[in-house]
């Protein structure tokens, strides 16, 4: 039996704070750390000193890039709870870093979505929300910046409903707004809460609800109680009988429905003005899940069967590495979430994906940028290990006697690449090491050498993503590099099916080469990927040569059909062929497969695909005409227009090739007042004139 835990599992919360880039997420996280007693001097983002944003660049750019994990403790606003541990995983809000968000959502149990009371639900919020839906993460909403001009709580609540298709249930209402924002109404306790400005909101007073708000409070309180009552027949009966529920019953009902992803409780405040954050922490404990409230994580056992691990110290150890970071003091830090069992520093763990055993050096618990060495971690904990060499993001580490591979993470394919070369000979060797380390940290960033030009090519999710990589090489590894023009990651595919023979025969003195195959090459749905099927009957091509044929096809697909870009979304079936007892070899069949694909694909109506980006531009009305005209010139397809307090919103799909340097152009079109976000949407067929120009350029 495991020894006793410091804090029981049901009093642990693993949460993320997710938000659009300017909703005030870092400030909210800061205040959480301040009130939980971790951080004594509040960091302010606009002074560039926030505790969570620990990489220099983030401090300069004022945006959060790396998801650091922080542990803090909370006893409740009125010290009403036993001690709870809250692990916060900081998630970035910038669209070039959705991979980081994905990675952190994978290991969270619940999340707080921060919305700006003025900007409301912005495009990035939608992206992150969709990702959270995919992982079934229960959420709370916090409408922040209630003190800002244009703040409107109920408008944001409606946007959560309309734009995110969620079911928001306010459990607070703001008292006043903009500079008159004074505090909040707690709908459960039916009290007004005013935080004390003299001690930065550490203390507060409860008061009666202002007269002029009573009618509205009654209306929203009824909606909240109905939402709670719908959690069970028992509560519904009590509500119908008494016309009310006790605060305990309301919390119980809301918790049940939040955990089932049926509702999103909404709170409000101003993190910057120190209002509302402690109540938000109480809500994290009241409504978000502990590790024991979420289903057991599934995975593949060593024998290939499906297995699972539930949150218990008594189960075998299993954890998922979700972040690798280089640390100037201790070297490589591997952040991981423990799903089951106990791990002590000095123990050995097994990495089933790499098939390697490794010893854990030190275990650290991170309090944003300070760290505490700990002796052990248990189910539900989030910590960092020092000394793991082969583990990369998304790998499982587990007990070698009970091997399991936990669900892997899916990482998107890069859409943009640039050639990069070291400025000096001295930078040459360092650059290889630096890029290798950065690629280990970030699976959406790739490095390869172009065989023809021998240039080093780096690929990523957007211009900002690659800029930051180059910047980090300079700062962390002291490598100066020249960066080429960004290149688009085009793809090729086919539009019709063909059957094609590939026959490779070489007779020279002695043993010859003989491989003969017939392939059926067919288009697949966009995004469906590559499929290879063996339909050989009667052994006309022996089974041992089939993998070689597939390898030949795959290699040829990398070389493209007309323009040299990788081929995607095709199905290749080998259905006929012949072999020679003496002369056939894997090599011969690989070449035959490659020949058949090359010839067949070129007859299958090949087309060039280009990445299309989903772009959202927010512009003051007076620049609308210029902005739309410019987007049309960039081959943009306008999808819709909307209003927001920040200006007109234009939703548009634009080929990535037309978007280079857009930030600068948009600034000059709108005198710096318009903003945009962009994320990868899909690959689509390039118009023939564009495709021809690209093919010509490639040849």
Curated annotation (Swiss-Prot):
Coiled coil: none annotated. Its main location: cytoplasm. It is found in: Cytoplasm. Residues 10-292 form the tr-type G domain. GTP binds at residues 19-26, 90-94, 144-147. InterPro entries: EFG_II (IPR041095), EFG_III (IPR009022), EFG_III/V (IPR035647), EFG_IV (IPR047872), EFG_V (IPR035649), EFG_V-like (IPR000640), EFTu-like_2 (IPR004161), G_TR_CS (IPR031157). PROSITE patterns: G_TR_1, G_TR_2. GO terms for molecular function: GTP binding; GTPase activity; guanosine tetraphosphate binding; translation elongation factor activity. Gene3D superfamilies: 3.30.230.10, 3.30.70.240, Elongation Factor G (Translational Gtpase), domain 3, P-loop containing nucleotide triphosphate hydrolases, Translation factors. Catalyzes the GTP-dependent ribosomal translocation step during translation elongation. During this step, the ribosome changes from the pre-translocational (PRE) to the post-translocational (POST) state as the newly formed A-site-bound peptidyl-tRNA and P-site-bound deacylated tRNA move to the P and E sites, respectively. Catalyzes the coordinated movement of the two tRNA molecules, the mRNA and conformational changes in the ribosome. Belongs to the TRAFAC class translation factor GTPase superfamily. Classic translation factor GTPase family. EF-G/EF-2 subfamily. This is Elongation factor G. It comes from Coxiella burnetii (strain Dugway 5J108-111). The gene is fusA.
């Amino acid at each position: 039996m495991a020894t006793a835990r410091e804090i029981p599992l049901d009093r642990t919360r693993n949460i993320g704070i997710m938000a659009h880039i300017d909703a005030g997420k870092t400030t909210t996280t800061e205040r959480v750390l301040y009130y939980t007693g971790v951080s004594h001097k509040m960091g302010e983002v606009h002074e560039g000193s926030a505790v969570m944003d620990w990489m220099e660049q983030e401090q300069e750019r004022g945006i959060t890039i790396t998801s650091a994990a922080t542990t803090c403790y909370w006893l409740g606003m009125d010290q009403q709870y036993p001690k709870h541990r809250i692990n916060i995983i900081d998630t970035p809000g910038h669209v070039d870093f959705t991979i980081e968000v994905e990675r952190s959502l994978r290991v969270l149990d619940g999340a707080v979505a921060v919305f700006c009371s003025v900007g409301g639900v912005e495009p990035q919020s939608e992206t992150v929300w969709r990702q959270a839906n995919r992982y079934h993460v229960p959420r709370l909403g916090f409408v922040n910046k209630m003190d800002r001009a244009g703040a409107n709580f109920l408008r944001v609540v409606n946007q959560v409903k309309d734009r995110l298709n969620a079911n928001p249930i306010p459990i607070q209402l703001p008292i006043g707004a903009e500079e008159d924002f004074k505090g909040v109404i707690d709908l459960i306790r039916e009290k007004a809460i005013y935080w004390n400005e003299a001690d930065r909101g550490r203390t507060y007073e409860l008061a009666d609800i202002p007269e002029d708000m009573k009618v509205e409070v009654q209306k929203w309180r009824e909606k909240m109680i109905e939402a709670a009552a719908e959690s069970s027949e028992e509560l519904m009966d009590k509500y119908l009988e008494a016309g009310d529920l006790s605060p305990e019953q309301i919390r119980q009902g809301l918790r049940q429905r939040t955990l089932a992803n049926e509702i999103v409780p909404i709170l409000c405040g101003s993190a910057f003005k120190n209002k509302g954050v402690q109540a938000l922490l109480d809500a994290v404990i009241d409504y978000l899940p502990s590790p024991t409230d979420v289903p057991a994580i599934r995975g593949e056992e060593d024998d290939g069967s499906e297995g699972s691990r539930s949150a218990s110290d008594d189960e075998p150890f299993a954890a998922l590495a979700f972040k690798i970071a280089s640390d100037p003091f201790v070297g490589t830090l591997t952040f991981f979430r423990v799903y089951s069992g106990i791990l002590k520093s000095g123990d050995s763990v097994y990495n089933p994906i790499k098939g390697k055993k490794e010893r854990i050096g030190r275990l650290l618990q991170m309090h944003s940028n300070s760290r505490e060495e700990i002796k052990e971690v248990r189910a539900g904990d989030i910590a960092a290990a020092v000394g793991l060499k082969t583990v990369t993001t998304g790998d499982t580490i587990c007990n070698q006697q009970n091997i399991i591979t936990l669900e892997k993470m899916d990482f998107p394919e890069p859409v943009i690449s640039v050639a990069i070369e070291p400025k000096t000979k001295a930078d040459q060797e360092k650059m290889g090491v630096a890029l290798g380390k950065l690629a280990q940290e970030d699976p959406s960033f790739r490095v390869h050498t172009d065989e023809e030009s021998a240039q080093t090519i780096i690929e990523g999710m957007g211009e900002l993503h690659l800029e930051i990589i180059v910047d980090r090489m300079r700062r962390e590894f002291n490598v100066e590099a020249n960066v080429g023009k960004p290149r688009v990651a085009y793809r090729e595919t086919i539009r019709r099916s063909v059957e094609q023979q590939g026959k490779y025969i070489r007779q020279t003195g002695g043993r010859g080469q003989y491989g003969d195959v017939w392939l059926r090459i067919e288009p697949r749905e966009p995004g469906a990927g590559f499929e290879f099927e063996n339909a050989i009957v009667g052994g006309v091509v022996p089974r041992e040569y089939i993998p070689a044929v597939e390898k030949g096809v795959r290699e040829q697909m990398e070389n493209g059909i007309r323009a040299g870009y990788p081929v995607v979304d095709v199905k290749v079936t080998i259905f006929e062929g012949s072999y020679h007892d003496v002369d056939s070899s894997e090599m011969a069949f690989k070449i035959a497969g490659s020949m058949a694909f090359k010839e067949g694909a070129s007859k299958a109506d090949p087309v060039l695909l280009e990445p299309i980006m989903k772009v959202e531009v927010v512009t003051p009305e007076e620049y609308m005409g210029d902005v739309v005209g410019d987007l049309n010139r960039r081959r943009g397809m306008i999808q819709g227009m909307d209003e927001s307090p920040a200006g007109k919103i234009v939703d548009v799909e634009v080929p990535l090739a037309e978007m280079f340097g857009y930030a600068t152009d948009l600034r000059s079109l709108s005198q710096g007042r318009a903003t945009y976000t962009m994320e990868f949407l899909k690959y689509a067929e390039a118009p023939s004139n564009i495709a021809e120009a690209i093919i010509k350029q490639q040849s």
